Amino acid sequence: MSVLKDRYENEIKQSLLKDMNLSSTMAIPKIEKIIINMGVTQAVTDKKYVDSAVEELSQIAGQRAVVTRAKKSIANFKLRQGMPIGCRVTLRGERMYDFLERLIFIALPRVRDFQGIPRRGFDGNGNYNLGIKEHTIFPEISFDKTDAVKGLNITIVTTADNDDMARTLLERVGLPFRAAPKSQENK
């Protein structure tokens, strides 16, 4: 069992139950899944970019990535329906906690001038989106062997009813949010 999952089961659940005044342990918010998406714009002109993106995303996630294809044709982008345009992977269970652990303790501290992740990434339903500009912050990716620096989007889906519950959960798990601006502290 990963350290993060063990900490969630033994410490975080109990503190959330007390702090949120929940009546049942089933109402405690938890992380349901993590979706990692990598869009590859160069895939329109060269198919090898998608193959390298799939390989690198599979190394980062520890699970085989799936190629995503265009739903519609867009002439201005020289895009045809069904063309590969990126890849994604959905993590659940043990692999999800392992990835989250590596993200929090290894990858995010390697970001240049890191001051925390933005607080505005919540969608209103208790889910959090985080964009990463360089996939090379993960230790699985060698900067010398990659053909181009790619960005990726990480979506953390929780069972929380609202953004405040989700923010509390993710802060307790250990996601390093930026300090709240002075105007938000009074709210």
Swiss-Prot record:
The keyword RNA-binding applies. GO terms for cellular component: ribonucleoprotein complex; ribosome. The keyword Thylakoid does not apply. One of its GO terms (biological process) is translation. Keywords: Ribonucleoprotein, Ribosomal protein, RNA-binding, rRNA-binding, tRNA-binding. GO terms for molecular function: rRNA binding; structural constituent of ribosome; tRNA binding. It comes from the Bacteria. HAMAP family: Ribosomal_uL5_B. Belongs to the universal ribosomal protein uL5 family. Part of the 50S ribosomal subunit; part of the 5S rRNA/L5/L18/L25 subcomplex. Contacts the 5S rRNA and the P site tRNA. Forms a bridge to the 30S subunit in the 70S ribosome. This is one of the proteins that bind and probably mediate the attachment of the 5S RNA into the large ribosomal subunit, where it forms part of the central protuberance. In the 70S ribosome it contacts protein S13 of the 30S subunit (bridge B1b), connecting the 2 subunits; this bridge is implicated in subunit movement. Contacts the P site tRNA; the 5S rRNA and some of its associated proteins might help stabilize positioning of ribosome-bound tRNAs. NCBIfam families: PRK00010.1. This is Large ribosomal subunit protein uL5. It comes from Brachyspira hyodysenteriae (strain ATCC 49526 / WA1).
